[in-house]
């Protein structure tokens, strides 16, 4: 292995967001021998940046890693090159930029493989990772490692990928849809003038989709269509009331528009996910991606859609670290390589990461580049 390769940072560069997973050692760097391995204890930590603000990500890496690691900047003479695991389309699109600005070379990992690897890592090693959310009730799910497969992974990023997972390294992308997080943000910006995903989500919290959506009760005079199992509050047509209200966009409250849009995207994803699970006889569906962000309304909408169409036979399950699946998968791919050439400056990098993982990493909604996801206690074996 190249001695300049660092084994505790991985990136997933998507169309909307850049996700980072990095290792933070506990206290001073220490080693203890166990079966011929050096064991470093610490935490996996998480951060995110908007892809359109990629310079913020570059500055984060430059200041928090390169500045303290003893690695000279690209303009200096004899600087070291760092090989970092990266996945997502941006690993190709921005490879030259990272090389030019930071002297970083990407060791690229396949996007689908990284997603599956990240989910399997979480489900097998992190307690209380998966949970259901229905009717306002959050329930953690105990995962039986002997009965994990097969399952359907629905990753909601800018678009949506649906992957049937049959085992470690055994998966197939069986479907997807272009109506995902990018659709929500794109239409939301056009319709509400919101500037960011977080701002749009916050706006949706205060909205009422019934002002714009046409419900079954609007068609049936306030009653259910019980013969086919539709309640009066079920949505018959998203944005349907705009047809006959005789109003212009400015006549509607932006929070109601945001709420209706979020409901429309979530319902659509939930239904398509179940239909694909039905094709392959899958009962467990895991939803991931930053579109969800632990938002109760989104999770409940997806869960209701899966529950309704499956008549209660299929489960929608969510993940605490939902937005970092690809980055985690890329990170765990370091396990396939030898670390016997680890050099002292790597230890310095680990301390540098630790220095920026404390109070500076508290989450500030909307304006922060840093994510509120919980850290994961872990150790790294250096062979």
From Swiss-Prot:
Tissue: Highly expressed in leaves and developing seeds. Expressed in roots, stems and flowers.
ATP-binding among keywords: yes
Alphabetized UniProt keyword annotations: ATP-binding, Coenzyme A biosynthesis, Kinase, Nucleotide-binding, Transferase
Catalytic activity: (R)-pantothenate + ATP = (R)-4'-phosphopantothenate + ADP + H(+)
Control of this protein's activity: Regulated by feedback inhibition by malonyl-CoA.
GO molecular function, one term: ATP binding
Family annotation (InterPro entries): ATPase_NBD (IPR043129), Type_II_PanK (IPR004567)
CDD domains: ASKHA_NBD_PanK-II_Pank4 (cd24123)
Pathway stated in the Swiss-Prot or TrEMBL entry: Cofactor biosynthesis; coenzyme A biosynthesis; CoA from (R)-pantothenate: step 1/5
EC number: 2.7.1.33
Domain of life of the organism encoding this protein: Eukaryota
SUPFAM superfamilies (alphabetical): Actin-like ATPase domain
Phenotype of null mutants: No visible phenotype under normal growth conditions, but homozygous double mutants pank1-1 and pank2-1 are embryonic lethal.
Protein's GO biological process: coenzyme A biosynthetic process
Protein's job: Catalyzes the phosphorylation of pantothenate the first step in CoA biosynthesis. May play a role in the physiological regulation of the intracellular CoA concentration. Functionally redudant with PANK2.
Family stated for the protein in its record: Belongs to the type II pantothenate kinase family.
NCBIfam families, A to Z: panK_eukar (TIGR00555)
Protein name as catalogued: Pantothenate kinase 1
Lineage of the species this protein comes from: Eukaryota, Viridiplantae, Streptophyta, Embryophyta, Tracheophyta
């Amino acid at each position: 292995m190249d001695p300049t390769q660092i084994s505790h940072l991985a990136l997933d560069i998507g169309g909307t967001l850049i996700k980072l997973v990095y290792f933070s050692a506990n206290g001073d760097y220490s080693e203890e021998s166990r079966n011929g391995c050096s064991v470093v204890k610490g935490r996996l930590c998480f951060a995110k940046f908007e892809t359109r603000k990629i310079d913020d990500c570059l500055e984060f890496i430059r200041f928090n890693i390169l500045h303290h690691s003893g690695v000279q900047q690209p303009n200096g003479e004899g600087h070291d090159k760092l090989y970092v695991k990266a996945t997502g389309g941006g690993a190709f699109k921005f490879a030259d930029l990272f090389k030019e600005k930071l002297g970083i070379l990407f060791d690229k990992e396949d996007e689908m493989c990284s997603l599956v690897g990240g989910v399997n890592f979480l489900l097998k090693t992190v307690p209380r990772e998966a949970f259901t959310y229905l009717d306002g009730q959050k329930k953690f799910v105990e995962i039986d490692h002997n009965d994990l497969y097969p399952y359907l992974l629905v990753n909601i990023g800018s678009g949506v990928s649906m992957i049937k997972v049959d085992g470690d390294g055994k998966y197939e992308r069986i479907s997807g849809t272009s109506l995902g997080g990018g659709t929500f943000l794109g239409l939301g910006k056009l319709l509400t003038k919101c500037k960011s995903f977080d701002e749009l989500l916050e706006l949706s919290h205060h909205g009422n989709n019934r002002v714009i959506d046409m419900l079954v009760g609007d068609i049936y005079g306030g009653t259910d269509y019980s013969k086919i199992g539709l309640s009066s509050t079920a949505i018959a047509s998203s944005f349907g009331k705009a047809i006959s209200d005789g109003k212009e966009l400015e006549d509607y409250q932006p929070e109601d528009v945001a709420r209706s849009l979020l409901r429309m995207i979530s319902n659509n994803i939930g239904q398509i996910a179940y239909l694909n699970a039905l094709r392959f006889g899958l009962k467990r569906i895991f939803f991931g991606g930053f579109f969800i962000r632990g938002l109760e309304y989104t999770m409940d909408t997806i869960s209701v859609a899966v529950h309704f169409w499956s008549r209660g036979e299929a489960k929608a399950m969510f993940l605490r670290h939902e937005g970092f699946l690809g980055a985690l998968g890329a990170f765990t791919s370091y396990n396939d390589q030898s670390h016997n050439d680890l050099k002292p400056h790597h230890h310095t990098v680990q301390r540098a990461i630790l220095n920026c993982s404390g109070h500076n990493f508290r989450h500030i909604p909307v304006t922060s580049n840093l994510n509120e996801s919980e850290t994961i206690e872990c150790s790294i074996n250096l062979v």
